[in-house]
Amino acid sequence: MTTEIKKLDPDTAIDIAYDIFLEMAGENLDPADILLFNLQFEERGGVEFVETADDWEEEIGVLIDQEEYAEVWVGLVNEQDEMDDVFAKFLISHREEDREFHVIWKK
């Protein structure tokens, strides 16, 4: 018997990702990127819920079921409203009782 996973709504996934970003950015981003983010976030900052990519296995070394995870990006958007400077990509489990996440930080 398969149990249905209640998926995160986009706003909740965004909140979780942004909270993790704020908590961990200082340890994982270059100081210049942190400064850039802080200076420009009010004007150009974005936290976007995106379609879960199929290349996470390459990034984290674990095969994932795209239906069980939400993907959120944190970064800066350009004049065309496209996120062109991604500081972190989050993969967040929809499972509330076992909320795991993976992060790919800007290098």
Curated annotation (Swiss-Prot):
It comes from the Bacteria. Pfam families: DUF440. Gene3D superfamilies: dsDNA mimic, putative (3.10.450.140). SUPFAM superfamilies: Putative dsDNA mimic. Belongs to the putative dsDNA mimic protein family. May act as a double-stranded DNA (dsDNA) mimic. Probably regulates the activity of a dsDNA-binding protein. This is Putative double-stranded DNA mimic protein CGSHiGG_01135.
